[in-house]
Amino acid sequence: TYNDNAMINVMNQLRLIYEQKVPFTFIPEEYQTKTRAAFDKGVECILKTQVKQNGELTVWCAQHDHITLQPTKARAYELPSLSGQESDEIDILLMSLPNPSQEIINSIEGAVKWFEKVKVEGLKKEFFTNEEGERDYKMVACTDCKPLWARFYDLETNRPFFSDRDGVKVYSIAEIGHERRNGY
């Protein structure tokens, strides 16, 4: 799972260990070697799970099936999708690797190209207090705002979508409840 950056957080810890970074300077060399091997297997998994659309590398799903490596559902509101959230941390990790292979370079470039293609422009979050006195937000048009990326994109169309605890895919964040809307 890449969900909530779980795997990337672990890989960053593994890297600190095999590079003997503080606070892991005391780890014996035999464990550093094992840790490096585990990290390298993680990179292999990242490369194998990168989703292709029409033969082009894109990004990753938050959750992949452990056998088929295909995008799969996690929690009820986390449908199979391309992830605009977890994928950025995956790509940043790959970008940080010294002397990357051509396969890693292609992976990075595919993800960057996808992020450029699907960025959402002309919208920003506007916060307000709702009728129950809770902090909430809505999306409003703007002309000079920075681009945004959705957390979930349709696997085939790249259209941003949202889902509530009922697992129903909708295309406006206003269509989901306060709890999930403010949990994205």
Summary of predicted features, one role per range:
Residues K52, E56, K113-Y184:
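CBM-like carbohydrate-recognition segments
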Residues N54-L79:
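Flexible internal linker/loop segments at domain or repeat junctions
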